[in-house]
Amino acid sequence: MAQIFHHSTNLISRLSIYGGVFILGLLGAALYGIELSPWYTEQNVARQQPVPFSHKHHAGELGLDCRYCHTSVEKSSFAGLPPTQTCMTCHSRIWTNASMLEPVRASYRDDKSLSWTRVNALPDFVYFDHSIHVSKGVGCTTCHGPIAEIPLTWRAGTLYMEWCLNCHRQPEKFVRPKSEVFNPYYTPPKNQLELGRKLVKEYKIQSLQNCSVCHR
């Protein structure tokens, strides 16, 4: 039987198949890279706020305790945002004419809350409780990064499920003494795993990975 196609057709077919697979793989890698990029996750990207609040100045240089502003972090699922009255505790006496603080003064005069932009906004289908985490020895910087060194607040983690599960699967790598939970300069010791295992047992920490724990 006469050959219909030229021998070169075999080469073209192979190149087409391999090329298609390569392009699909390249496209998948590109999409994966985009999904992990700050452009998509907003990780390490400072959010625009009504007032350029600096954690570096307040928590770092002045040494304000996290709980001074985030008053409900130990007893509620939400850490809480400070009312304008908290800001005015200091700023009714210092930096009283600073133009960048005019929104704070206007908020106080008009008795109208500032509209802060959430930096770590979880989807509605995710349940998270701040109080249980801090009560089990999870420090602020574990999730929020070196907050006392950040001028304008940004998201330190991706907030992806994998990011949360890294800690839930091996809490001994991240847990710290309760006395150090609000210490923004805490550094894990060299024997972190040994200390972590001890604290996991002492604090009765469970490695919770069931879907219903966070997706209720």
Task: Give the ranges of each region predicted by the language model.
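Primarily the internal scaffold of c-type cytochrome electron-transfer domains
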Residues: I4-H6, I94-V126, P171-R216
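Beta-hairpin (beta-strand-turn-beta-strand) motif
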Residues: H58, S92-R93, S131
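The canonical Cys-X-X-Cys-His
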Residues: G63-S72, T84-R93, C140-P146, W163-Q170, ...
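N-terminal export/targeting leaders of redox proteins
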Residues: M1-P52, K56-G60, L64, Y68, ...
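Soluble extracytoplasmic domains of inner/organellar membrane proteins
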Residues: D124, S131-K178
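A short, flexible N-terminal coil/short beta segment enriched in small residues
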Residues: Y18-F22, C90-W95
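Nucleotide phosphate-binding site architecture
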Residues: A59, M88, V134
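Short Cys/His-rich "knuckle" micro-motifs
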Residues: S76-G80, N97-L101, I150-W154, F174-P177
